[in-house]
Curated annotation (Swiss-Prot):
Signal peptide: none annotated. One of its GO terms (cellular component) is cytoplasm. Belongs to the BRMS1 family. Keywords: Apoptosis, Coiled coil, Cytoplasm, Isopeptide bond, Nucleus, Repressor, Transcription, Transcription regulation, Tumor suppressor, Ubl conjugation. It is found in: Nucleus; Cytoplasm. Transcriptional repressor. Down-regulates transcription activation by NF-kappa-B by promoting the deacetylation of RELA at 'Lys-310'. Promotes HDAC1 binding to promoter regions. Down-regulates expression of anti-apoptotic genes that are controlled by NF-kappa-B. Promotes apoptosis in cells that have inadequate adherence to a substrate, a process called anoikis, and may thereby inhibit metastasis. GO terms for biological process: apoptotic process; negative regulation of cell migration; negative regulation of DNA-templated transcription; negative regulation of NF-kappaB transcription factor activity; negative regulation of stem cell population maintenance; negative regulation of transcription by RNA polymerase II; negative regulation of transforming growth factor beta receptor signaling pathway; positive regulation of anoikis. Its main location: nucleus. It comes from the Eukaryota. It comes from Mus musculus. Residues 51-98 form a coiled coil. This is Breast cancer metastasis-suppressor 1 homolog. The gene is Brms1.
Length: 246
């Protein structure tokens, strides 16, 4: 059989049950209070967050405006400094004191000196070449003049000799013609005298041994042919001398 508790124990157990129920009720109430306080704190924190956000936003905007203002001031200051530096450099360049101007200027002046020296040397060479060319042309002109003078002298000498030869031939032809006419006249006079002489006293033609040329022409025709041959030979001889010459 099961053992039943006594009355005292039963009362104690009931008292303990009531105290446990009271404790549970208090715990529930504390939890409700805690949840309520949390809700209130959350509402308060949300309100505080909005205010903090606005406050921080306004602070950030003000800081940004300050930064923009400082940046504009720095930018303006930098612009003024750069402008003053450029003006200073411009003044130095105008006064020929700027290193950006003096250093390249020194290099250019050195290059100018070198180029002037090279130009002077080149000028000397050009003058020597021109002088040598002038002397060569002058010498060539003198040689050409001398050769032309010699050629002219030879030409005139040949022409004069040709004229002298022609005059000599003409004189000889005239002498021959005069002799021929004298002989002709003498022969005519002698033939007339021979006709008057008796045939026994006439001279007989001499007999010639060896080659003998019998001319079928009259003496006047032979004389004309001989004169023409002499003139032709006199005309050919100067041309032959020119062809044989240099």
């Amino acid at each position: 059989m099961p053992i039943q508790p006594s009355g005292k124990e039963t009362e104690e157990m009931e008292a303990e049950g009531d105290s446990a129920a009271e404790m549970n009720g208090e715990a529930d109430e504390s939890e409700e209070e805690r949840s309520g306080s949390q809700t209130e704190s959350e509402e308060e924190s949300s309100e505080m967050d909005d205010e903090d956000y606005e406050r921080r936003r306004s602070e950030c905007v003000s800081e940004m405006l300050d930064l923009e203002k400082q940046f504009s001031e720095l930018k303006e200051k930098l612009f003024r400094e750069r402008l003053s530096q450029l003006r200073l450099r411009l003044e130095e360049v105008g006064a020929e004191r700027a290193p950006e101007y003096t250093e390249p200027l020194g290099g250019l002046q050195q290059s100018l000196k070198i180029r002037i020296q090279v130009a002077g040397i080149y000028k000397g060479f050009c003058l020597d070449v021109i002088r040598n060319k002038y002397e060569c042309e002058l010498q060539g002109a003198k040689q050409h003049l001398e050769s032309e003078k010699m050629l002219l002298y030879d030409t005139l000498l040949g022409e004069l000799q040709e004229r002298i030869q022609r005059l000599e031939e003409d004189r000889q032809s005239l002498d021959i013609s005069s002799e021929w006419w004298d002989d002709k006249l003498h022969s005519r006079s002698s033939s007339k005298a021979g006709d008057a002489m008796p045939p026994s006293k006439r001279k007989k033609a001499p007999l010639v041994s060896g080659p003998y040329i019998v001319y079928m022409l009259q003496e006047i025709d032979i004389l004309e042919d001989w004169t023409a041959i002499k003139k032709a030979r006199a005309a050919v001889s100067p041309q032959k001398r020119k062809a044989d010459g240099p």
